Amino acid sequence: MCSSDLIAARARSLSAARAIIIVSAHWDTVAPTVGFADRPPTLHDFHGFPAALYDLRYPATGSRAAAEQVVDAIHAVGLAVERAPARGLDHGAWIPLRLMFPEAEVPVVPLSIQSHGGPRQAWQLGRALAPLAGQGFLVIGSGNVTHNLRDYRQAAHGGGPIPAYVRQFPSWLADRLLA
């Protein structure tokens, strides 16, 4: 079974979600920012791939009510939060969603990351989102712990083995997260 089949199977095993909060590593802002688009457009925020990839769309719907609940939850833990009225879904959001929910039947609320916010802010954001999971929200974090396409392509096209840092970093990270 390939990874896309595993993702689809896992999605089918989840209970029906009221809305999906998708946190993509490809939307990085200073403050947590919540997308409010009624029909978030599919963003093709990449280059150098086969033309067919640029034709793919994910016809998601948004939910202003769900987005407002996310804003309220973030405010409740003392974090400032921004609203993005027209934010679309970047490839870190729509690609996994397209595999998990191909019919786009569940409303989607995009949420940005803050790569310079530090661990305390990330922890607070997690505290804000946790109660929403108990209210029918599915919270999905998307992205790899390493993302160097140059090294990946070099290895994939016969240019050598996967670099050691790519093989070692996930274990290093897991050890620290579980400590």
Sequence positions of predicted segments:
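A charged helix-plus-loop insertion that forms the helical arch/lid used to bind
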Residues: 35-59
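Internal, conserved structured core segments that host functional sites
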Residues: 67-123, 128
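Short, small-residue-biased leader/transition segments that mark boundaries at the very start
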Residues: 1-3
